[in-house]
Amino acid sequence: NGTLAAFVDALHELDIDVSIIDYQEHAITAGFDADAAAYVECEVNGIPVHGAGIASSINVASLCAVVSAVNRALTELDE
């Protein structure tokens, strides 16, 4: 996914190292304007985490999933 790769590259510029291990996506409603869900398993600065995102666009849902995972990892680092 080019959008996801570009986002991961941008995070790297902020010293947030994200390695995506697994990525899944699917529609959660039917029809032309279906909402999408995305799930990522990744390592953020060496911490294994999962993230999920839901949006009307699969690209936005994917970005939200990565943000969710990054937030989880950064919270663990702060503890």
Residue ranges and their predicted role:
Residues 1-79:
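Polyanion-binding surfaces on beta-sheet-dominated domains and ring/shell assemblies
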